[in-house]
């Protein structure tokens, strides 16, 4: 059981869908495939040479189409375990081009979260931190 499994994945910002893949199977736990590393995924063009990848979505859950404009907070799919993934999770990656791994990586800013218990109004979580959205704390 994984908390994130089949949870809705929301667009983190307004943008245009420039790539989407759906129909790849979710992997059995602990098994990974290297030939489609992102699995089912969506790439949003945020403008200003900023592209965000939302990867490892659940098979059959991608809810947006290529060229579609999406609003911040709009559901784009559901959390899964497709692609090169050993367990359900969402992979978020920002870079300067729409092709995975082809561009320069960009820092991703988040708002209203706690990192290791400390409230952050805006910042960049780092490896090893436990991160909780403020909205989840209030529930």
Labelled PLM ranges:
Residues 3-5, 62-63:
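Short, small/polar residue-rich loop motifs at catalytic or cofactor-binding pockets
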Residues 10, 50-73:
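Short histidine-centered loop motifs in beta-beta connectors
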Residues 14-58:
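Zn2+-dependent peptidoglycan hydrolase active-site motif and core
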Residues 36, 63, 68, 93-139:
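Acidic, glycine-rich catalytic/binding loops that coordinate metals and/or anionic ligands
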Residues 57, 87-97:
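Histidine-centered catalytic micro-motifs
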Residues 63-65, 81-88:
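Short glycine/proline-centered loop/turn elements that form peptide/ligand docking sites
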Residues 71-83:
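Short hydrophobic beta/alpha edge segments that flank linear recognition/processing sites
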């Amino acid at each position: 059981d994984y908390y994130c499994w089949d949870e809705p994945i929301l667009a983190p910002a307004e943008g245009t869908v420039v790539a989407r893949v759906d129909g790849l199977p979710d992997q059995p736990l602990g098994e990974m495939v290297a030939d489609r590393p992102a699995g089912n995924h969506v790439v949003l063009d945020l403008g200003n040479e900023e592209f965000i990848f939302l990867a490892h979505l659940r098979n059959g859950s991608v809810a947006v189409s290529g060229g579609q404009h999406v609003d911040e907070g709009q559901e784009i799919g559901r959390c899964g375990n497709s692609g090169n993934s050993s367990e359900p999770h969402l992979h978020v990656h920002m870079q300067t081009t729409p092709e995975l791994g082809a561009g320069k990586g960009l820092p991703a800013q988040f708002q209203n979260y706690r990192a290791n218990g400390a409230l952050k109004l805006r910042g960049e979580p780092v490896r090893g931190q436990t991160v909780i959205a403020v909205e989840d704390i209030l529930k």
